A protein has these predicted regions:
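Terminal targeting signals and extreme-terminal segments of soluble enzymes
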Residues: 1-76, 80-178
Length: 178
């Protein structure tokens, strides 16, 4: 079952060039999946009761164009499959006219937060999301060979505002910090 919401690009989400930033895009995608989970009764409070969380394992994001300040956008997400403890989810961001701005493929692990181990999501959960086919986009290989680094970066502190409800660094915050 696909889920969408519409918004406008805010001043607080843009960079010097007047366009949405990558962390801003990731926030939209992440918020869309959270809104869907809340709408189907699988939201933050329900997961907390179960002692579980969906934890991002991998992103593949294609950006065709970053939207600009004030531009109206539609963000859509859907589950594209479940296998064991993994959930596959796709995202799109489009203009009002249907121009594809960005899309993403993601893999999430359903984790028992007490043990830290992945566990199979309950059937009621996977049924609630339903499955729509995967996005028609060639994301290429998921594993990227890291180039040799000629420097070691400086360590940076993780502050309370970087943490999410799972007490982990939020996905978009991580990108901003790195």
């Amino acid at each position: 079952m696909k889920y969408s919401f519409t918004s406008r690009i805010r001043y607080s989400e843009i960079g010097e060039d007047g366009n949405l930033t990558l962390p801003g895009l990731i926030n939209y995608f992440q918020d869309c999946s959270t809104f869907q989970s809340e709408a189907i009764g699988e939201g933050v409070a329900e997961l907390k009761k179960r002692g579980c969380a969906w934890v991002l394992s991998a992103w593949q994001i294609h950006v065709r164009r970053y939207p600009s300040l004030g531009e109206a956008v539609k963000i859509t997400t859907w589950a594209s499959g479940f296998k064991g403890f993994l959930g596959m989810r796709n995202f799109t961001m489009e203009t009002e006219d249907g121009e594809m701005l960005a899309c993403a493929n993601s893999i999430w692990s359903y984790v028992n937060m007490e043990t830290g181990h992945p566990v199979r999501a309950p059937k009621e959960t996977t049924d609630a999301y339903g499955i729509d086919g995967p996005i028609d986009e060639d994301f290429g290989e998921r594993k990227v060979k890291m180039p040799e680094a000629d420097f070691i970066g400086e360590p940076f502190p993780v502050r309370p505002h970087n943490l999410d409800t799972n007490h982990h660094v939020n996905n978009a915050q991580f990108i901003s910090l790195a």
